[in-house]
Structures are given as C-alpha cells and as structure tokens.
Design a protein with these regions (language model features):
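Beta1/beta-strand and adjacent pyrophosphate-binding region of the FAD-binding site
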Residues: 4-18
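Short, well-ordered coil/turn residues at beta-beta hairpins
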Residues: 14, 183, 189-190, 272, ...
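Conserved N-terminal/central alpha/beta ligand/cofactor-binding core
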Residues: 32, 38-150, 159, 267-276, ...
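Conserved redox-cofactor binding core of oxidoreductases
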Residues: 44, 94-178, 182-184, 195-199, ...
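Glycine-rich loop(s) and the adjacent beta-strand/alpha-helix scaffold that form part
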Residues: 174-247, 454
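An active-site-proximal "capping" alpha-helix that borders the catalytic cofactor pocket
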Residues: 223-230, 444-462
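An anion/pyrophosphate-binding glycine-rich loop and adjacent beta-alpha core
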Residues: 224-226, 230-344
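A glycine-rich dinucleotide-binding beta-alpha-beta segment and adjacent secondary-structure elements
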Residues: 342-433, 437
C-alpha cells in the first residue's frame, strides 16, 4: 500500500521517458521520489511506448551513429522545420545537452542499435533504441526500482494545488479512490492533450472525431489544463500538433508507429476530390513527415489517398495493411471511392509535368515537375507501371504543442512573470517552448530526456535545501 502520509522530496506526474529521466536524475541526486502514472502497468509510459530513437549531437562517428552531427547543422534543421518558431536559447541548450543523452540512457540500462533502413534515413542523426520504446521503458523502470523510486500506477493527477506560485499538494485518483500526495517539489511530465477529442474539438470542430490517436489514450491533458487555469504561462499554438499520414485502416487509438505510411515522397497525394494539395517532395522525409497529418486533417472529411505504382513499392517501408492495387487508374479510383475521370486527369497532368532526372530516394534529387501546381520538387517519377497502387490516409496525431512555458532550469513560469517556487516541467507538456510548429524525427525524445534530467536535478537540489 502506498504511503500517502509521507512527504516526498519530489513528485513526478507522468510515466514516460521525460518523467522517468526526471525521477531517476532526482533519485541519483539523493531525493526521495514518487511517480504518479495514470496508466496501468501494461500501458505505462505514455507515447514513449511507441518511440524508436532520439536525435543526438555528436562530433564523430559512434557505435550506432555515422559521421558527425554538429550544433549549427542541428539548429539549422530545427529552424527549417519550425520556421523560426522556437526559443533559441532553450533550443541550443537542448541540442548541446543531447550529446550526453545517449550515455545517460545507457547508464539506465537502455541499449542502442544502428539505424534501421527505410524512408527516414536517420543513420547519421538519430540513435535507435534496441527493442524500441517498450525496451527503453522497461530499462528505465528497472532503474527506478533499483533506486527505490515509488511508482503508483492507475494514478491520475487531478489537481496540483498552487498558492503564491508554489505547489502544496497533489490531489490524485489512485485506482479510482481519492488520495493526496505531499511533496516538496513537483515535476509535471504528463504529456499533452492529444487523446482528448473534446479539447481538440475546440479548435478543429467535428474533424477531431476523425483523428487517429497514434499513442496513449491517457494523454487527456488534465495536468496541463489544471496548471494553465492556476496561472502557469502558456506556450505554443493550441491548434498545432505533431501528426503524420496514417493508414486510414488503422485503429483509432494506440496504433503506434507501424500505422504511419512513408509512401508520400514517392507518390502523389490527392483528396476526396482527386486533387493534389501539397508538394509531396518538398524536402527529406524526416523533416516533412510530421506536417502531413495536419495537411490531411485540413482536407474534406480529413481524408486523402497516396497514389503510386509498382516501381515505387521498394523505396519505402512496407505497410501493415496491404496496398490497394488495380490494373488501371480508373479501376483504382473506383476502389477508393473517387471519381475515375478526375483521378485519371490528375495523374495524367502529373505525368506530363514530370522532368526525369537521377532518382536518389534518400537525397534531394533532381527528379521534379515543371509547370504543375502544386509542384513536386523531388522524387517525381511518372506513375505508369502496373499494377497501380494506393493507400488511404487519415491524420494520426502524436502530441500537441500547447504547453507550459519554462526557463533554462525547467521551472514553470507563471503569468506574473516569476518562476514557480517548486514546480518544474519536462517532455511533451513543455515541448512547445522549442517546437512551435513542425518536427524533427527523434527530437521529442531529446527534449524529454534533456529537460527530464534538468528538472530532476533541480527539483532534488531545491528539496534538499
């Protein structure tokens, strides 16, 4: 039975990578730590269950990373995907600290492997977890247990009582029963509100009911909403989220990484009216895959279709659900519920606009269109080899960008301009400080690890004084 009478040094709200990085760092610094994880054991870990890698600065090749990936290139990649919507000081701090993130995770028992082959082409920039997100979490929870960290599962943090900028106690529901947890410091690491369709609906209307939730159903945003209501500063656009082009046949909740479709750069993508609406070859897929969920969400009925042919199948990771195939574009349209004449016209116009070049699937090649709007800037090849292939798309939402504003000590800033006396934040709940829009593959895990470590160390230091 948990000791609810005890006063802990550090309470961590959340149970994913950011939360465990914080809890472990605090415990290693000598603090007594309790973790409140909303999910039961089989579902523990939030979206970290579905992750694969983190993006890390490195000056030379490592056991799992090729070449080098330095600060200026890293920051330039971030600026491109966010269009400058980032706090540069926090971003650069995160990038620099990412250099030691893999070693920290290794010290927790996490093992790494070289990049997998596929469309994302991350061998130089991202370190992959051996066994994926579940193996990562299992290692972190084992380390937490070894350090004597108390973990409460099925425990929803419903209210963090703030007075004069300081959290006094947490009101929780532990296995359905109300309890209180007292702690000298609190770290909010409970994620965003991507699984809360009601909250999403405030910005997206009925379209939110058609979004597929890629990860945990427990990301309801309760801690975030509670803290914003009590004067924590808001950061990030509430309409922005990380979302990918998911297979429309995927589960509506918790489908994970495998439901993402990586065929977009080697296809044309049309909406319900069989019209293209964006440049499919705009940039390398790791810098663009996270905009496609939003693009699809903006289409009629939040639906789209990737159209390609048999020559492209080998250029991207295979889908869980089989592709839809037909011997003619018209027959393919019938299977998709599209107007055959309109799809034939769209494919025909695209084929006529293609200017062949040297096709290089992992680089920005010179295969492009000319005189077509929207253009296809790279990887443009005529769709002409039978059978023709299609994949139905829906937006798969990963996390939201609305969050808590923090400083470089991971302290939550209040609307009066001051930092909270004892409240810190890490992970998706504060990622909007650095990711104002767009995404870099693996960077969410980097933010969670870096700010989790900072929050844990700072909370432990404060609790001891």
């Amino acid at each position: 039975m948990p000791d609810f009478a005890r006063r802990w040094d550090v309470l961590v709200a959340g149970g994913g990578n950011a939360a465990l990085s914080a809890a472990i760092s605090a415990a290693r610094a000598g603090a007594s730590v309790i973790v409140a994880e909303h999910a039961p054991v089989p579902m523990r870990g939030g979206n970290s269950r579905h992750t694969r890698n983190l993006r890390a600065l490195h000056h030379r090749p490592t056991e799992v990373l090729t070449d080098s990936y330095l600060e200026d290139e890293y920051f330039d990649d971030l600026i491109k995907v966010t269009a400058g919507r980032t706090d540069e000081a926090l971003a650069r701090m995160t990038i620099r600290a990412s250099q030691t993130a893999p070693e920290f995770l290794k010290s927790c028992g996490v093992r790494f492997q070289p990049s997998l082959s596929g469309t994302l082409s991350l061998a130089r920039t991202n370190a992959f977890f051996l066994g994926g997100g579940k193996a990562l979490l299992n290692a972190l929870y084992r380390e937490a247990e070894r350090l004597g960290i108390a973990v409460l599962y099925d425990t929803e943090v419903q209210h963090l009582a703030i007075e004069d900028g300081e959290v006094g106690e947490a009101i929780v529901a532990h296995r359905g029963f109300p309890e209180r947890i007292r702690a000298r410091t609190v770290i909010a690491a409970a994620g965003g509100f991507q699984a809360n369709r009601g909250w999403l609906g405030e910005y997206w209307g009925e379209a939110a009911d058609r979004f597929q939730i890629r990860g945990t159903p427990y990301a309801q945003g309760g801690v975030l909403k509670d803290l914003l209501a009590q004067g924590a500063q808001q950061v990030g656009d509430p309409t922005q989220f990380h979302a990918v082009a998911n297979d429309a046949r995927a589960p509506m909740v918790d489908g994970g990484l495998a439901m993402r479709l990586d065929c977009v750069p080697f296809s044309i993508v049309v909406n319900r009216d069989a019209k293209r609406f964006h440049d499919e070859g705009e940039d390398l897929w790791p810098k663009r895959y996270a905009i496609w969920g939003r693009l699809v969400a903006q289409q009629p009925e939040s639906r789209a279709f990737a159209i390609t042919d048999s020559q492209a199948i080998q250029d991207f990771l295979p889908s869980v659900f089989p592709p839809i195939k037909a011997e003619t574009i018209g027959a393919l349209a019938v299977q998709l519920g599209l107007d055959p004449a309109l799809l034939e016209a769209t494919v025909g116009a695209y084929n006529r606009a293609v200017r062949p070049g040297r096709f290089r699937p992992t680089e920005l090649d010179d295969c492009r269109t000319e005189g077509l709007s929207p253009p296809k800037s790279h990887w443009a090849r005529r769709i002409e080899r039978k059978p023709f292939v299609a994949y139905p798309l829906r937006p798969g939402i990963t996390f939201t960008f609305l969050g808590l504003r923090v400083d470089d000590h991971a302290r939550v800033l209040m609307t009066n301009g001051r930092a909270s006396a004892n409240l810190f934040a890490a992970g998706e709940i504060m990622a909007g400080n650095i990711l104002g829009q767009g995404y870099l593959a693996g960077f969410g895990m980097t933010i969670g690890t870096v700010f989790g470590r900072i929050a844990g160390e700072e909370a432990a230091r404060l609790a001891r004084t």
